[in-house]
Amino acid sequence: MLTAALAELRGMGIEKVFVNGDATSEARPAEVRRFAEIMNTFGAPERQWFVTRGNHDRPHKPDADSSAGYDEFPVLEGTEDHRDPFGVLLGRPRQELWVTQQGPVRVIGLDSSKLVESGGEISPGQFDALEQELQRDPNKPTVVLAHHPITSEAGWTNAAGPIFILNSADARRLQQLLNDAPGVFFAGAGHTHRAKRTRGDFGAGVDYLETGACKAYPGGYTLLHVYSGGYQVNFHRLSSEDALAWTARARWAMYGFEPEALLGELSDRNYVVNRVIA
């Protein structure tokens, strides 16, 4: 699915790709290396492609899978015996943000993964770094990416409930930081596999979107086209024969309810927002 997505994006002339977490199944070293190998066919890391950490990419103890090779990596500082192939191999230390400038737009990637659970959190240190970055230029047009959704609406409407998203205290603090920076216009999430646009808990300046999964149903990618008068969001289903066959098979997960739970409304997948971006 990832190979098919990159081929389509390359054919469309897309120059930058952002993978918003869950790049692997369980962050096994072989999985991380294979992900990087596939992505490097598109371009150079930190230049043509960027990745945040999802819950599946979190550190693991060697006894989680004795044959995976976790024990070849050093013990993660501050943990009993967790190893972090994702962080080591991709140069993404746990709970550290990254920033890249794409034309007039600043893109900030957050690590919202917990050490051992599927829900999300943001460390005090990462919050401090985010606040400093936003305050450095609060009016700069900014996109923020984090694997876990952060709105109450996202928590109460996803199948697993509020425990599945960013914890409530961190979600409130993150929304406040984004709301206090007038340049932040878009906050993208993954995790739920669905296409779903939700309202923030306060303020109306930030657009919160969960994008549909690539690896399974609904099987696609989301394009964000930013221009001086606003931006356009479009979800594209993968069109290769193998990708369509897998998507058709994957739609029967969740007892056949995946289309109802994950595809979302047309307005969740395709829309335009008019605002000044300069």
At which residue positions do the language-model features occur?
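Active-site/pore-lining binding-face segments in mid-to-C-terminal subdomains
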Residues: 183-186, 190-242
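A short C-terminal boundary segment appended to hydrolase-like catalytic domains
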Residues: 227-278
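Extended active-site neighborhood of metal-dependent phosphoesterases/phosphodiesterases
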Residues: 29, 33-136, 165, 169, ...
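N-terminal active-site segment of His-dependent metallophosphoesterases
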Residues: 1-29
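Short catalytic/ligand-binding loop motif for oxyanion handling, primarily in non-cytosolic enzymes
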Residues: 25-28, 58-62, 116-118, 151-154, ...
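His/acidic metal-ligating clusters that form di-metal
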Residues: 7-16, 101, 106-108, 117-207, ...
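Active-site glycine-centered loops adjacent to acidic/histidine catalytic or metal-binding residues
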Residues: 21-22, 54-55, 147, 190-191
